[in-house]
């Protein structure tokens, strides 16, 4: 690879995402038991010895100047009760377990520097006291790029909304299994790295990166299918930056490149046969509750607000992706409970709620759906209540659960319970006819 101008950057995850290590070496976890957790024990001196030895072997194999240590999504649940972790916190003078991760990453950064290498980590590593030659890969949001740049770190932009190529690239029913979500080639091409950063900070962005996580990628051919032509779009962003974009012109060139790739034995997605976005998203739906007042008896999750309190009655259906700004997320016991005020007594014949199932991010259909009606908003009559068997299949699907009948009411209360194994409920519209 090096002879061909390609740098392979190895990634060794720490302190989280380490289930396989702690199954083989349970003594490096806080519990000392296999299959109990995914985090190294940062209070155990053996953890540092082990990771140093692993990194030495990695550096022997890989000539890359950059070594990626992960640093993302550590649960840290056991650190607060672990005697070794508590002892380490006291020694370091820190009062929160987050400081333990910062210490471990900083320690490993210095170790790599001593061996002539530079640390790369996901944006969670920003909290550490790292050397200025650190590179941060930002996957969560531009505000973290701003934070990293403020610390003097180089930044690689890799936001999940544009750069996660394990997501579907076309209508899910027509595609092999993917990790939920929807990122077509056109969306990748639309990405402008650091678009809401000051120009001086944008100049600190080293580049962009695509991620193809392989939980659902069983073969090299399928990996090629998920990579191309989306990788072509991201590559053009990498060298074209914020210059004027012209997707139709790019698509023409991409179609030609797809034929070239096929001639070379590569297995790309056939962009010319693309179906595109969910058809329900493309045209507003009219119904009797559009614009009505909605009272949330249980709040939506702040990370998935969509359009706020007007979301469920704005006439706008969601697309293939739960994070497209049209889907509202709910989590917890009895988490979906809203009351719609139609403004006056109204004849109604159906109340349907559109739900998503996307098992990758643990979004499931509800296990129970209930509809009640009222004239005064206080005394409700239940008109529909049905339980449903929970399943983690299909991977991505959409379903409208509905009551049908004949009633006259001003207020409609709609409730849904999460699946029998928990997870999220995602809703885009309550359609009243």
Labelled PLM ranges:
Residues 1-117:
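Substrate-binding cleft of carbohydrate-active enzyme catalytic domains
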Residues 11-17, 72-74, 124-126, 139-141, ...:
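An acidic- and aromatic-residue-enriched active-site/binding cleft used to recognize and process polar
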Residues 19-24, 79-81, 147-148, 167-168, ...:
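Short, solvent-exposed loop/turn and secondary-structure capping segments
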Residues 48-56, 106, 146, 225, ...:
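Amphipathic, non-transmembrane alpha-helical secondary structure
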Residues 119-134, 140-284:
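Flexible, acidic glycine-rich loops studded with aromatic residues
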Residues 282-317:
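Predominantly extracellular/luminal regions of secreted and cell-surface proteins
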Residues 319-384, 395-433:
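Aromatic, loop-rich ligand-recognition surfaces of beta-strand-rich domains
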Residues 389-395:
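Short proline/glycine- and polar residue-rich coil/turn motifs
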């Amino acid at each position: 690879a090096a002879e061909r101008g390609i740098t392979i950057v190895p990634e060794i995850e720490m302190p989280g995402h380490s289930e396989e290590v702690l199954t083989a070496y349970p003594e490096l976890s806080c519990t000392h038991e296999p299959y109990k957790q995914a985090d190294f024990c940062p209070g155990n001196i053996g953890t540092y010895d082990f990771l140093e030895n692993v990194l030495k072997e990695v550096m022997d194999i890989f000539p890359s100047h950059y070594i990626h240590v992960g640093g993302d999504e550590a649960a840290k649940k056991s650190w607060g009760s672990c005697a070794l972790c508590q002892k380490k916190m006291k020694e370091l003078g820190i009062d929160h377990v987050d400081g333990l991760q910062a210490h471990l990453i900083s320690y490993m950064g210095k170790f790599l520097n001593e061996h002539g290498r530079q640390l790369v980590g996901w944006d969670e590593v920003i909290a550490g006291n790292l050397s200025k030659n650190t590179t941060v890969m930002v996957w969560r949001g531009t505000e973290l790029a701003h934070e990293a740049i403020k610390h003097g770190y180089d930044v690689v932009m890799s936001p999940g909304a544009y750069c996660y190529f394990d997501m579907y690239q076309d209508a899910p029913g027509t595609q092999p299994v993917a990790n939920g979500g929807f990122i077509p080639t056109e969306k990748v091409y639309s990405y402008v790295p650091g678009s809401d950063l000051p120009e001086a900070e944008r100049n600190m962005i080293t580049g962009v990166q695509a991620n193809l996580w392989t939980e659902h990628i069983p073969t090299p051919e399928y990996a090629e299918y998920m990579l191309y032509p989306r990788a072509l779009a991201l590559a053009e962003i990498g060298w074209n930056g914020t210059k004027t974009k012209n997707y139709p012109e790019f698509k023409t060139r991409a179609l030609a490149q797809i034929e070239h790739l096929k001639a070379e034995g590569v297995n790309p997605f056939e962009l010319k046969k693309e179906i595109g976005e969910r058809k329900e998203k493309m045209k507003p739906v009219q119904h009797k509750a559009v614009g009505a007042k909605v009272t949330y008896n249980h709040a939506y999750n702040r990370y998935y607000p969509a359009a706020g309190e007007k979301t469920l009655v704005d006439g706008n259906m969601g697309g293939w992706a739960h994070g497209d700004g049209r889907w509202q997320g709910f989590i917890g016991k009895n988490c979906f409970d809203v009351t719609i005020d139609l403004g006056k007594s109204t004849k109604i014949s159906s109340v349907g709620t559109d739900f998503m199932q996307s098992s990758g991010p643990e979004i499931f259909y509800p296990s129970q759906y209930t509809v009640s009606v009222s004239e005064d908003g206080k005394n409700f009559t239940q008109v529909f209540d049905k339980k449903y068997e929970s399943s983690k299949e299909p991977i991505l699907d959409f379903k409208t659960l509905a009551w049908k009948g004949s009633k006259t009411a001003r207020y409609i209360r709609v409730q849904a319970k999460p699946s029998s194994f928990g997870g999220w409920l995602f809703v885009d519209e309550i359609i009243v006819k």
